[in-house]
Curated annotation (Swiss-Prot):
<dbReference type="Pfam" id="PF07973">
    <property type="entry name" value="tRNA_SAD"/>
</dbReference>
<dbReference type="InterPro" id="IPR004095">
    <property type="entry name" value="TGS"/>
</dbReference>
<dbReference type="InterPro" id="IPR002320">
    <property type="entry name" value="Thr-tRNA-ligase_IIa"/>
</dbReference>
<comment type="function">
    <text>Catalyzes the attachment of threonine to tRNA(Thr) in a two-step reaction: L-threonine is first activated by ATP to form Thr-AMP and then transferred to the acceptor end of tRNA(Thr). Also edits incorrectly charged L-seryl-tRNA(Thr).</text>
</comment>
<feature type="region of interest" description="Catalytic">
    <location>
        <begin position="240"/>
        <end position="538"/>
    </location>
</feature>
<protein>
    <recommendedName>
        <fullName>Threonine--tRNA ligase</fullName>
        <ecNumber>6.1.1.3</ecNumber>
    </recommendedName>
</protein>
<dbReference type="GO" id="GO:0005524">
    <property type="term" value="F:ATP binding"/>
</dbReference>
<dbReference type="InterPro" id="IPR045864">
    <property type="entry name" value="aa-tRNA-synth_II/BPL/LPL"/>
</dbReference>
<comment type="subunit">
    <text>Homodimer.</text>
</comment>
<dbReference type="InterPro" id="IPR012675">
    <property type="entry name" value="Beta-grasp_dom_sf"/>
</dbReference>
<keyword id="KW-0436">Ligase</keyword>
<keyword id="KW-0694">RNA-binding</keyword>
<dbReference type="InterPro" id="IPR012947">
    <property type="entry name" value="tRNA_SAD"/>
</dbReference>
<keyword id="KW-0030">Aminoacyl-tRNA synthetase</keyword>
<dbReference type="GO" id="GO:0004829">
    <property type="term" value="F:threonine-tRNA ligase activity"/>
</dbReference>
<dbReference type="GO" id="GO:0000049">
    <property type="term" value="F:tRNA binding"/>
</dbReference>
<dbReference type="InterPro" id="IPR002314">
    <property type="entry name" value="aa-tRNA-synt_IIb"/>
</dbReference>
């Protein structure tokens, strides 16, 4: 007999081999409707998994987020089975559940598929669902697995990783696959799904390997949930900064130049320049010292910092020079700022020292991960490093958070949460080895946030290798989560670079480094702004704030030019549309470009020294004096509206 604890701390004895489904039917069906899977001692298992030891059982129902992951993993197998029926020669690699669905990487060998094939695959998937195959788990030896998948070279490679582990396969009808699970127990539980897109992906993410076909999909328990998600995808497409950019012409990429290397076009460069000037001025008001440092460095610098050991796969190849020197494009700015601190001796009275930079960095993102401005290979980070005494940590973190919240207010960022990231105490190998340091750093961060009275969440295992961090997770207009701001405590780099200050006792002491970014990279922040505003920038950020539209270029251009000069003297960004088009066409074009104010100038305006304007998205026209219009614009800019 085994003892199982479950709902409401009940403990019952069961025959060894009893399944979660049997326990649910006997004891839990009234409390938990529509079971999907289970957790046994916090480990996910199938409903038909035989329990053979004492433990705690938790039933996962359709409403549990973990259940959606199980469903999507199972749908990946359902899709693979359908593909196998349609393309018997297809070779399957991996098919995991991901954040909003699943994908499967497949070598179709002699076949090529496209989006036109999605409906055919979905039709077979629905057929298999109706066949209601039982999905069963089977544990086999390494040798048996090698024979079972002898036809599939990809599985042979994957199996080598599990030579000394328990190997499991899952079967449903004629289909079987190498998999850890967990899955639903029958195919007819998989009903509401959609294949979404197709792309290329290297086997195991290695560009040296063959390019496979990656098919993405998603699955839900309810038909309406699927419909709602598909509608959300359509809304995302409308907000996608890559799509909006086709109209606004803010940035571009060029294959001849290289993947993930953005060009900032005039209008995008204008927005970036405004953001950069804003953030620099804001940081100067907080007593930061702004610097410029080289975009590359000797590899020795990154050996000392530890990046060569922990971050080499994300760095570009080393450049070996004739004189033996080895240089590398920097993936981070922190080692350079360590060098600035180390240039001079420091007294405890000088601290904290705040060094900031809009620092260009280069990171070797895999080709499949590069996406618009959100994932690029060249980026400029709003970076800073604060060198402080240990007794100054709390106060500095509070100042950083106040700075972040001020910036968020100006950019109208309202939906966010604080997340404290700690190391995983059960898996400390990938972190700097100093238990006392980790304890002190995590304790300090947590106490500081509590003293500020701010709500926060905790994330175990998400810390940087050199210390715990505070991330500000921003939720965009469509509910997606992204990290814009981060604060990281670092007790390691000061040791590695032997940084010191002279204390009151006239002895050398070790400072603490606080890494900090407020608006992430310029690239990611512009993408965020575009998607949040749908390209309708507030007046203070708009690349063109006012478009002057003369009704007749020959008659009204000169007066339009005078108004342009008047506005430019007040530092407004103004253009004139003097093209030989109709007035209606010019106004529609201005709307398409999402220009905040469109000013029409005709005879009435010219004779009476007036302007007639309409705001973006409005049909209402207002006629006022030029100086009144200037005052209106100034107020809007001042209010960051």
């Amino acid at each position: 007999m085994i003892k199982i604890s479950f709902f409401d701390n009940q403990i019952q004895e069961f025959i060894s081999g009893t399944t979660p489904l049997a326990i649910w039917k006997e004891h839990l069906s009234e409390h938990f409707k529509k079971p999907v899977a289970a957790l046994f001692n916090n480990q996910p298992i199938e409903l038909d998994f035989p329990l053979k030891k004492n433990g705690n059982l938790e039933i996962l129902t359709e409403s549990d987020p973990k259940s959606l992951e199980v469903l999507n993993h199972s749908t990946a197998h359902l899709m693979a089975q359908a593909v196998a029926r349609l393309y018997p020669d297809a070779l399957f690699t991996v098919g995991p559940a991901i954040k909003e669905g699943f994908y499967y990487d497949i070598d179709f060998q002699k076949h090529t598929i496209s989006e036109k094939d999605f409906l055919t695959i979905e039709k077979v998937m629905h057929q298999i669902s109706l066949e209601n195959h039982k999905i069963t788990r089977e544990e086999i030896s390494f040798e048996k697995a090698k024979k079972l998948f002898a036809y599939n070279p990809y599985k042979q490679v994957l199996l080598e990783k599990f030579r000394d582990q328990t190997i499991s396969i899952y079967r449903q009808g004629e289909f079987f696959d190498l998999c850890r699970g967990v899955h639903v127990i029958k195919t007819n539980l998989i009903k509401h799904f959609k294949i979404l897109k197709i792309s290329g992906a290297y086997f195991q993410g290695d560009a040296k390997n063959k390019t496979l076909t990656r098919i993405y999909g998603t699955s839900f328990f309810k038909k309406q949930a699927l419909a709602d998600y598909l509608q959300l995808l359509e809304e995302r497409k409308e907000r996608d900064h890559k799509k909006i950019n086709k109209e606004l012409d803010l940035f571009m990429f060029n294959k001849e130049v290289g993947l993930g290397l953005p060009f900032w076009l005039p209008k995008g460069a204008t927005v970036r320049r405004i953001v950069e000037r804003y953030i620099v001025d804001k940081e100067l008001s907080y007593d930061y010292h702004h610097v410029y440092t080289p975009i590359m460095a000797n590899t020795e610098l990154y050996r000392i910092s530890g990046h060569l050991d922990h971050y080499a796969s994300n760095m570009f190849p080393i450049m070996s020079l004739e004189n033996g020197e080895k240089l590398v494009l920097r993936p981070m700015n922190c080692p350079h700022h360590m060098m600035i601190y180390k240039k001079n001796p420091h007294s405890y009275k000088e601290l904290p020292l705040r060094i900031a930079e809009l620092g260009m960095m280069h990171r070797f993102e895999k080709s499949g991960a590069v996406s618009g401005l959100q994932r690029v290979r060249e980026m400029t980070l709003n970076d800073a490093h604060i060198f402080a005494r240990p007794d100054q940590i709390k106060e500095e973190i509070k100042k950083i958070i106040n700075l972040i919240l001020e910036v968020y207010c100006d950019f109208n960022i309202k939906n966010y949460e604080l997340r404290l990231s700690y190391r995983n105490p059960n898996n400390t190998e990938k972190y700097f080895n100093d238990d006392q340091m980790w304890y002190n750093a995590e304790k300090t961060l947590k106490e500081t946030i509590k003293e500020l009275g701010l709500p926060f969440k905790e994330a175990i295992g998400e810390a940087a290798f050199y210390g715990p961090k505070l991330d500000v997770q921003v939720f965009n207009a469509l509910g997606n989560e992204e990290t814009l701001s981060t604060v990281q405590l670092d007790f390691l780099l000061p040791q590695k670079f032997d940084l010191t200050f002279i204390g009151e006792d006239n002895k050398h002491h070790r400072p603490v480094v606080i890494h900090r970014a407020v608006v992430s990279t310029m690239e990611r922040f512009l993408a965020h702004l575009v998607e949040e505003t749908k390209g309708v920038f507030p007046l203070w950020l708009a690349p063109v704030q006012v478009l002057l539209i003369p009704v007749s270029a020959p008659l009204h251009f000169e007066f339009s030019q005078k108004i342009k000069e008047t506005l430019q003297l007040q530092n407004f960004r103004v253009e004139i549309n003097s093209k030989d088009n109709t007035l209606g066409y010019k106004i529609r074009e201005a709307q398409k470009l999402k220009i905040p104010y469109q000013v029409v100038i005709g005879d009435h305006e010219m004779i009476n020294n007036l302007i007639t304007f309409r705001k973006y998205g409005s049909h209402l026209q207002t006629t006022i004096k030029v100086d009144e219009f200037v005052s209106l614009l100034k107020d809007k800019v001042l209010q960051k509206k």
